[in-house]
């Protein structure tokens, strides 16, 4: 199965924990069974990520029911290591300007109402469900507990470090930014060239072609990959070369070397 291939590959890569991200899905039972089999710990997010949520009674009731169902379903797996309330919701509210934007453009009262819903879900409902149905497993209300650029992010709780990529810092930054627990970091690459060929024609062999751009979901994606390749690998990426297609396969392959370099350094 795809799960078997993925999780056995994680073990072969010497990984010991898998995070089920709050912007995804609660996984199928077979996923947790295979994590048990392979000895992989599971960091399990509840399915909340990168957004504020309603606080009306019907929504809060549905949150409670969904949490109870999944906690009861997953709790018996020895691979389960942690329940986490959400991905980046608190960090975004406090540090990405969300709260201040609401206060400035609407009102303090509306901001308070929005955060009251946050408090209800992540500090009351979910901890109560864990306390009642899975007291043996720890609960962490939000990941990360701080934000990139804030000193406390490296000394308290877990961290998501995106100075590399979003901040375009060199990979060597990772040698200095060492938090207590790094729960998220990353960098993009293009897929294997054999995969790229399945959705392109030779006339599309330009990372800024319409086809390549339509497969790039990050606003800074292709330009950031290109900047790091020129910085770290001195790949010649003039528009003339790209239009001719001469360098396109090497361009794609070089982006994968960047990922290799980052993972080797970070892990």
Predicted regions and their residues:
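Substrate-binding clefts and catalytic carboxylate motifs of secreted carbohydrate-active enzymes
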Residues: 83, 90, 121, 128-267
């Amino acid at each position: 199965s795809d799960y078997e291939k993925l999780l056995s590959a994680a073990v072969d890569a010497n990984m010991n924990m898998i995070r089920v991200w709050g912007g995804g899905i609660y996984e199928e039972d077979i996923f947790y069974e295979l994590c048990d089999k392979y000895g992989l710990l599971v960091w399990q997010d509840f399915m909340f990520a990168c957004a504020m949520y309603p606080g009306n009674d019907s929504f809060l009731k549905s949150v409670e029911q969904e949490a109870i169902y999944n906690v009861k379903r997953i709790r018996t797996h020895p691979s389960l290591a942690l329940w986490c309330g959400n991905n980046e919701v608190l960090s975004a509210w406090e540090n990405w300007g969300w709260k201040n934007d609401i206060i400035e453009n609407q009102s303090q009262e509306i901001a308070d109402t929005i955060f009251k819903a946050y408090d209800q879900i992540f500090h009351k409902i979910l901890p109560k469900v864990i306390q009642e149905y899975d007291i043996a497993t720890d609960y962490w209300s939000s990941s990360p507990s701080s934000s990139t650029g804030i000193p406390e992010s490296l000394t308290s709780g877990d961290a998501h470090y995106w100075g590399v990529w979003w901040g375009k810092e060199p990979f060597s930054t990772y040698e200095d930014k060492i938090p207590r627990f790094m729960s998220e970091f990353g960098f993009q690459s293009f897929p294997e060239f054999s995969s790229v060929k399945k959705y392109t024609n030779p006339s599309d062999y330009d990372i800024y072609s319409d086809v390549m751009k339509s497969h790039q979901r990050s606003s800074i994606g292709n330009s950031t990959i290109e900047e790091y390749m020129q910085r770290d690998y001195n790949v010649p990426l003039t528009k003339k070369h790209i239009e001719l297609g001469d360098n396109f396969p090497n361009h794609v392959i070089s982006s994968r070397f960047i990922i290799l370099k980052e993972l080797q350094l970070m892990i």
